[in-house]
């Protein structure tokens, strides 16, 4: 049996400053720095533009107090098996649910609600041991049978079904009261990452969920540090301290420290920052470069925790919708993506660098091969590619030869996002070959449009701080099964590469396989990129524990990675 420890399949190292990235230097091109016997990836240096190290909290924690945080949007729902979740949603979910596994500062995964996780030799059977004496908020005990009973709901869930398919999970069995055996149809060395994610890794009460699924989204029941108190959608969600929370620190402190946390969706970036500066809220989340710039200039009344790693802005083409089913159109539009101007419109000058793949240039998974395949700005080349499609009598959109193509370009209604989309619109329209319609929907609708495949050209964020399999494998999986294949592009070779990467713990081999996928995505022009996404939690002085949280075994976590997500169980308000 192989015991799963924090070193496995990690992306980076132990002190964050942008995703999982950290402060010890590593040359990505040097084989000697990679430990191929374990699957731990070496540490890397984060960009100078964003500098926040993750260090353990040293100040003595204090019980009591409340925090109100402004989020960039409302949660699509609070059912981990059903609702597609982004960063604001996970900020709420992480207060209510516990993950079975959690990411650590070394980039790998360690047990959280689990006590241990082991695999067989070919990574097709995983055995998980739960912590004893854990109860849900309604008093129901968490057992191995709970995990088994969750599985049918997850198989039918919109969010979990695609995650299950991508993980190759086929069966879940209770070995005893606290031992669960997961059986996979194929090898999957990255399976622990699935148990750290919401769709598969957040235990919920299956009986209550089956009895009233819609109600569960309003009154979710988890094992987490806080219990839902009230949920006023689009206004405020309030959670209060779980007096029976299982997590007791090495110093004997029963978590959490706070009495309550309030989550307020404030979609407008300026309004959200102003709410913090005026004292209406105590903290604010942002994934917008312009807001980080403004917060930096706001003075000493607030403190910033920043992070930049494997999260890149950009967008995608839905290949199920003509004319995006034709590579010539995708290449033509991508050659008209002026990354420098888009980054400036986003307010990211001096903060973000242009990206070419899902990994930042200082990350161990980044490759020159994928970077060289990325389509860079070439207006004349873009015109030539679009013209070839427009003049084709067999063009897929059914229009007459010579007619312009129609493009609906959609993004949420944030001013910087609108400005960035206007840069694209001006260049695309300026070719005199494209009719562009700009649309804006709130983030929840924007996500749902992608999930339901009614999108065309759609702005999006790409990447992730954990094992690449967690984000890439669902993206390349069968589009009929995986909702994460937002581009609806099915490539058997990419599926095979992802499967091969799942079947080995050799880092160099896995890195090449994911480089193949990133290169193919660029060659097919399925996505366009802008720059790396810096993220931020800004807060009033005195709020502690956001960035330096630890796991039950004392190991340091990953700070606010990914994408400005807070683990609320160790946050406290200092009295000093």
How would you name each of these model-derived features?
Residues 129, 163-208, 225-232, 335:
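Surface-exposed binding/hinge segments that line
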Residues 226, 353-392, 413-419:
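Structural transition elements
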Residues 67-121, 152, 221:
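N-terminal lobe/hinge region of extracytoplasmic solute-binding protein
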Residues 537-576:
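Long beta-strand-rich cores associated with HINT superfamily self-processing modules
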Residues 104-105, 196-256, 260-262, 380, ...:
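Gly/Pro-rich hinge or "lid" segments in bacterial periplasmic/extracellular proteins
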Residues 388-464, 507:
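Ligand/substrate-recognition segments at binding pockets and active sites
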Residues 214, 245-294, 433, 442:
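Ligand-site clamp/hinge motif
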């Amino acid at each position: 049996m192989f015991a799963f420890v924090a070193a496995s399949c990690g992306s980076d190292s132990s002190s964050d400053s942008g995703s999982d990235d950290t402060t010890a230097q590593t040359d990505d091109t040097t084989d000697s720095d990679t430990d191929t016997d374990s699957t731990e990836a070496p540490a890397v240096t984060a960009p100078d533009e964003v500098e926040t190290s993750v260090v353990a909290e040293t100040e003595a924690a204090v019980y009591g107090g409340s925090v109100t945080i402004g989020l960039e949007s409302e949660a699509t729902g609070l059912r981990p098996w059903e609702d597609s979740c982004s960063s604001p949603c996970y900020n709420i979910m992480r207060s209510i649910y516990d993950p079975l596994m959690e990411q650590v500062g070394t980039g790998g995964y360690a047990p959280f609600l689990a006590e241990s996780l082991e695999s067989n030799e070919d990574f097709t059977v995983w055995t998980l041991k739960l912590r004893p004496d854990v109860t849900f908020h309604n008093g129901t005990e968490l057992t191995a049978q709970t995990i088994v009973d969750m599985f049918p709901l997850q198989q039918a869930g919109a969010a979990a079904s695609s995650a299950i398919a991508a993980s190759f999970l086929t069966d879940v069995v209770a070995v005893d009261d606290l031992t669960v055996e997961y059986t996979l149809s194929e090898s999957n060395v990255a399976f622990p990452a699935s148990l750290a994610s919401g769709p598969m890794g957040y235990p919920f009460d299956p009986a209550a969920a089956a009895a009233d699924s819609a109600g569960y989204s309003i009154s979710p029941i988890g094992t987490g540090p806080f219990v839902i108190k009230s949920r006023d959608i689009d206004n405020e969600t309030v959670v209060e301290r779980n007096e029976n929370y299982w997590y007791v620190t090495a110093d004997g402190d029963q978590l959490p420290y706070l009495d309550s946390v309030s989550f307020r969706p404030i979609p407008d970036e300026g309004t959200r920052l102003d709410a913090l500066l005026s004292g209406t809220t105590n903290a604010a989340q942002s994934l917008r470069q312009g807001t980080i710039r403004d917060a930096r200039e706001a003075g000493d009344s607030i403190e910033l925790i920043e992070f930049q790693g494997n999260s890149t802005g950009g967008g995608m083409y839905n290949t199920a919708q003509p004319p995006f089913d034709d590579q010539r159109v995708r290449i033509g539009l991508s050659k008209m993506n002026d990354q420098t101007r888009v980054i400036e419109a986003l307010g990211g000058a001096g903060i973000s660098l242009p990206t070419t793949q899902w990994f930042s240039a200082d990350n161990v998974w980044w490759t020159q091969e994928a970077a060289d395949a990325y389509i860079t700005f070439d207006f004349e080349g873009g015109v030539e590619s679009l013209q070839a499609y427009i003049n084709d009598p067999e063009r897929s959109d059914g229009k007459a030869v010579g007619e312009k193509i129609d493009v609906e370009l959609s993004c949420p209604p944030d001013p910087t996002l609108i400005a960035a989309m206007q840069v694209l619109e001006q260049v695309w329209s300026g070719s005199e070959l494209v009719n562009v319609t700009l649309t804006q929907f709130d983030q929840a609708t924007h996500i749902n449009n992608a999930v339901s495949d009614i999108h065309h050209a759609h702005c999006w964020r790409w990447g992730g701080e954990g094992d690449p399999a967690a984000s890439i494998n669902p993206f390349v999986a069968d589009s009929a099964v995986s909702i994460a294949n937002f581009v609806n592009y099915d490539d058997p070779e990419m599926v095979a590469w992802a499967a091969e990467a799942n079947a080995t713990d050799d880092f160099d081999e896995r890195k090449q396989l994911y480089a193949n996928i990133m290169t193919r995505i660029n060659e097919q022009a399925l996505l366009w990129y802008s720059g790396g996404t810096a993220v931020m939690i800004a807060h009033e002085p005195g709020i502690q524990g956001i960035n330096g949280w630890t796991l039950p075994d004392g190991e340091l976590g990953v700070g606010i990675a990914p994408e400005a997500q807070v683990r609320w169980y160790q946050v406290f308000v200092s009295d000093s």
